[in-house]
Amino acid sequence: MKLGIIGAGKWGSALHFALSKKNDVYITSRHYHDLKNFVSLEEILRLEYLILVLPAQVIGPWLEKHPLRKDHKVLLASKGIDIKKKKFLNEILQQFIPQEHLAVLSGPSFAAEVQKGLPTAVVVSSSNEILAKTYAQMFPDFMKAYVDDDVVGAEIAGAYKNVIAIASGICDGLKLGNNARAALLARGLVEMERFASHFGARMRTFLGLSGAGDLFLTASSTLSRNYRVGLGLALGKDLQRILNDLGEVAEGVYTVEAIIEIAKEHSIYVPIAREVYEIIHGKNPKLSIIHLLERNGDD
C-alpha cells in the first residue's frame, strides 16, 4: 500500500519507521528534508491514503491552506482540541472530507519505543469499518492495531489524557506519593469519560487502550511531555520556560483551555481540568492538587 505522512516530528517519524515495514510510505515536512522517502507536499497529496501528524493547533489553518480532496482517506494521528474554534479535530477534518473517509489513531504509544520496534498496541477508530481495517492492516507485527468505531471517544480520550498527565506530573513533582497519583488517575479517567459521554462517546472506550491505556502511560513517565510540564510546574518553574526547555509541543497546555471553554458551554463538571487550568494561570500547585484529593463526591 502507498501512503503519505504529513508531519515529521517524533511521532510522524516513528510512524514512518513502523509503517514502512509493510508499505511504501512517503513523508513530507517543512523542516526535515533528509528523511528517507521525503517528497514534496504536492506529491503526498496525489496519494489516496494519508496520515496527518501535525500539531493540533496547526491542523485547522493547514487544511484551509491545503484543502484535501473529497476522495482522500485520512488517519488522524494528532491528539488535541482546536483551541481557537473549540472544536474536536474530527469536526475540523469533516469540513474537508466525508466522515466515512476519516479514521483516528489512539492508544498508548510513545514515539521513542515505536522507533525501536518495541511491542505496542493501538486502536484505529472509524465509522467506516472497511477503512479502519485497511489502516489497521498497514501496521507491522510489533504494532498491533485494533479496530473500533467510537471516533469521538478515541479522539477525546487522546486529547484529555494530556491534561490529566499534567496533573499527574504536578502530583509527582510535589512528592505526594503513589497513593495520591493512583487516586488522581482514577478520578481523571472518570472525568474524561464524563466529558466525552456528553458528546456521544462510549464508556468502554475509556476502559481500553484509547482511554485507560493511554492515560496510564502518559501520566506516569518522563517520556511524556505533558507529564514533564507538570513536574516543572510543581517546582515553581515558569510555564514558558518549561515549554522552551521541552523544545516540543505539549498539547495538554492548549487542550485544557479548550476543555474549560467547552465544559462551561455545556455545563460539564471537570474539576481536574479546572485545577490544571488555574495552575497554568498562576495558582499554587500544591493547594490545587491537595484540594482535588480532599474534595467530597463520587467523581
Swiss-Prot record:
Q: Which residues cross the membrane?
A: none
Alphabetized InterPro entries for the sequence = 6-PGluconate_DH-like_C_sf, 6PGD_dom2, G3P_DH_NAD-dep, G3P_DH_NAD-dep_C, G3P_DH_NAD-dep_N, NAD(P)-bd_dom_sf
Catalytic site positions: K161 (proton acceptor)
Q: In which pathway does it act?
A: Membrane lipid metabolism; glycerophospholipid metabolism
Q: Where is the signal peptide?
A: none
Q: Where does NADPH bind?
A: W11, R30, H31, K79, A111, R225, V249, E251
Q: Where does sn-glycerol 3-phosphate bind?
A: K79, G107, S109, K161, D214, S224, R225, N226
User: A Gene Ontology CC term for this entry?
Assistant: cytosol
What processes in GO biological process is this protein linked to? Answer: carbohydrate metabolic process; glycerol-3-phosphate biosynthetic process; glycerol-3-phosphate catabolic process; glycerophospholipid metabolic process; phospholipid biosynthetic process
Q: What does this protein do?
A: Catalyzes the reduction of the glycolytic intermediate dihydroxyacetone phosphate (DHAP) to sn-glycerol 3-phosphate (G3P), the key precursor for phospholipid synthesis.
Q: Which HAMAP family match?
A: NAD_Glyc3P_dehydrog
Protein name, UniProt field: Glycerol-3-phosphate dehydrogenase [NAD(P)+]
Q: Which organism is it from?
A: Nitratiruptor sp. (strain SB155-2)
Q: Give the gene name.
A: gpsA
